[in-house]
Design a protein with these regions (language model features):
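Extracellular "complement/coagulation-type" protease architecture
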Residues: 2-264
Length: 264
């Protein structure tokens, strides 16, 4: 089997049976991988930009609030999605309760996104909400980074993805993990030609990583959004880097969609 076939994207899609850590379960139709393995539970309101994407009420990907009308996520989370079935939950760390539910009127994926055949380059999409969300201590936009984090920087990633690479268990509460930025030259030593300039790589080590369900979620440095969870090597948390969308190279796309300049 080629190296490419060992890649996974970090989204939960329908047919996979997911078991909450409190014993509840969700059934999805097909399985792709993405979760936080080896992370810790976030305090309520500590990550106010984090959102949960729902399809017919079921959580399947993460995202980040970037304006009061816009959510950024991974394009592989929303290919051909029926927006009448899509909602965004903001303002809560729980998958079971709290927060606000928002409808979506438009999904815009990057025009250069192709998918797996192009190694998930430009894996970014922006959701336009049906109504403006109210900024509170529990839900607020995060600034978009215009420069990349330095090599070796500690980055914060968060999500509700699977807790263990060998299990379908997912948390009911938001998890977070500190990972380390690495340059693409070093990243290519492991992930090879699949790593492009539009990818940003980070890792923590064996036993700690993003996984199924974390797709589209935020990668943050110094309070700015530097990346979006995109893809990694299977199994999760095997000690190799994961690939994120490099936000500093997505600014033109973002500005076209949201209709305003990103602060430089």
């Amino acid at each position: 089997m080629s190296l490419f076939h060992h890649q996974i994207v970090f989204c939960l899609v329908f047919g996979l049976s997911v078991i909450f850590t409190n014993g509840a379960s969700i059934n999805f139709d097909v399985g792709l991988e993405s979760r936080i393995v080896g992370g810790a539970q976030a305090e309520e309101g500590a990550i106010p930009y984090q959102v949960s994407l729902r399809l017919n009420g079921w959580p399947f990907c993460g995202g980040s609030i970037i304006t009061v009308f816009h959510i950024v996520t991974a394009a592989h989370c929303v290919p051909g999605i029926n927006i009448s079935q899509l909602t965004v939950i903001t303002g809560t760390n729980s998958l079971e309760s709290g927060g606000e539910t928002h409808g979506v009127v438009e999904v815009t994926s990057h025009e250069s996104y192709v998918g797996s055949s192009d190694y998930w380059k430009y894996d970014i999409a922006i959701l336009t909400l049906a109504a403006e969300l109210t900024v509170t201590s529990l839900q607020s936009p995060i600034p978009i980074a215009t420069v990349d984090p330095p090599d070796g920087a500690e980055l914060l990633v968060s999500g509700w993805g699977r807790l263990f690479s060998e299990s379908n268990a997912v948390p009911t509460k938001l998890q977070y993990l500190w990972v380390v930025a690495i340059n693409n030259t070093e990243c290519r030593e492991t992930l090879r030609e699949e790593v492009d300039d539009v990818h940003l790589c980070a890792l923590r080590g064996v036993g700690s990583a993003v996984c199924s369900g974390d797709s589209g979620g935020p990668l943050v440095y110094n309070g700015t959004l530097v990346g979006v969870v995109s893809w990694g090597r299977s199994p999760c948390a095997s000690g190799v880097p994961d690939a994120y969308v490099r936000m500093s190279l997505m600014l033109d796309f973002i500005e076209r969609v949201i209709g305003t300049a990103v602060s430089k």
